[in-house]
Amino acid sequence: MSEHDYWQVESSVYGGVGYAPATLEEYAAIAKALDDEAAGFATIATAWESAALQLQSHRHSAPMCVTLQSGDPSAVVPGHVTAPYAALGNRCYDHATACQRLSDDLRGAADLLIRAHSLYSQAEMTARRMFTELLQAGTQAKPGYAAAGVAAVAAGGFLAGWTIDGKPNPAWMSTFTYPFQEGVLSGAGGIIGGVPIGKSIAHTDEVNKAAGKIANFSGPAKDVVQGNHLDVREVQANADVVRASGSVAESMENLRRLAEERLGKIELNSGLEYGTIAIQRYERSDGTNSWLVTIPGTDGQPDSPFGWAQNVELMSADQERRRKADSARMVAEAMRQAGIGKDEPVALIGHSQGGIVAATLASDWAEEYTIEHVVTAGSPVANHPIPQRTWVTSVEIDDELVAALDGAANPVTDNWLTVQGHVSPAPAATPSTVHSDGSCTPGATPITGLTPYDAAPVAGSTNGRELSHWIKYHQAAYQNATDLGSPAVQRHEAHFQEVINGELKETRYYQGRMTQSTTIAPGERTTEFSTFGG
């Protein structure tokens, strides 16, 4: 690959409320009819190609005949007459190409219909669950073989990626191993969590049980190193980082801006640092408030509540342990300081650890806040006990690894929708050009596909493959799901917009820091939980 590689994401939709079963059956029948017609035109294309080959064979059946060999009627030899074989052959190939193009268009339309309306999603999820359970049982029975097998596939991916990129690139290891990640991780979780083989069929929370056991040791160890005193204070931004939002897509863009600004990936000169979240208050036409909380992911700083160790506590199957996670405590305290009322509607959006925090708040702070909608990007939240009244929109990439750390697929329910994206190479973007006469040709970011709905381009370029855990990949996945016209996505989008409907009145930023001391600066608040013996 080159120094400027471009990517696209093709999405599939699972869960949510689509059309009635009878309507889905009609769509399935239409998709099948389109696929059947595509197969028919493919057969015709093959027949035309065969005819062209037969004509060519007939031309060469008499090697001593100059006129027949040339296939040109103008090459007249007295006493000989020939058909225009060259022209006939070309016409056959033209017909074959046209029929194949029709076949591809029809098959593409069927595929778009299937993806937009999740026509076979139930069968896909059932097969995925069975495969995961088999891998889990195999991992528990023969953990050494499972580890060796995954390591071999990862090594093969590493070598293949080295060949493709021309340099060593570990990102390819996740690309090659993603079909096995959930099953092997759930198997490892079963071993650590002490779940017997076979008894896990009715459950999917093996990883969470294992995380709970690990957190009993990692939590106290983290407190010794980092401290357990959490200071939360409001900070001011010098730039408009998180702007007004009226949709999931706009909120994801704000999430990306805040996440990359605090990590130094972009420079908005806001002055915001790591461990920072945003809380926005929207005022509705009736004077009531609604709220949107934007929560970036792990930053890994030594005194940040969004460190690596907090992920383990957030993933625990134990509610008390989850509530002790510093990042969850930090967001809950910021929401309290912002003045969010118990009965005021709240939407949460988070990436990676931020999404796990959002799911934890929806699960474990349900009595304190009215959390109506949660949007997660690349977050392993399949086993969080989010109440039915809360809508969940999860966006994941199949090979990003992080979203698979829960060892299970997300629930497929009316209120829980998952957009799963698949990354593939895209054509290079074309820059804008200004011509000598002053006219301008705008640049374009093309995709590989027959229609604009086949995939959505990922913003920017890369130098080879990279982990698809960056928010820009989730943005492309959600864009493609939206472009498909999925009724389930449309309903979730409408619900999210309804929750935050109103005029943006304020955007406030809150920063969290972990300390060993209870001494706090003016305007700061501190919260502390004992992680020993509790």
What spans do the regions from the language model cover?
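N-terminal secretion-targeting helices of virulence/extracellular proteins
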Residues: M1-Q140, T531-G534
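Polar/charged alpha-helical tracts
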Residues: E25-K32, D36, K209, R336-Q337, ...
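A short, terminal or domain-edge coil/loop segment
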Residues: G108-A127, G187, E396-A404, P431-D437
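Long, composition-driven intrinsically disordered regions
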Residues: A137-L348, L361-T370
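Lipolytic serine-hydrolase domain surface
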Residues: P296-R329, A334, I340-G341, E368-H373, ...
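Extended hydrophobic secondary-structure segments that form protein cores and membrane-embedded regions
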Residues: A347-G350, V374-T376
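Gly/Ala-rich beta-loop-alpha elbow adjacent to hydrolase catalytic centers
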Residues: I349-A359
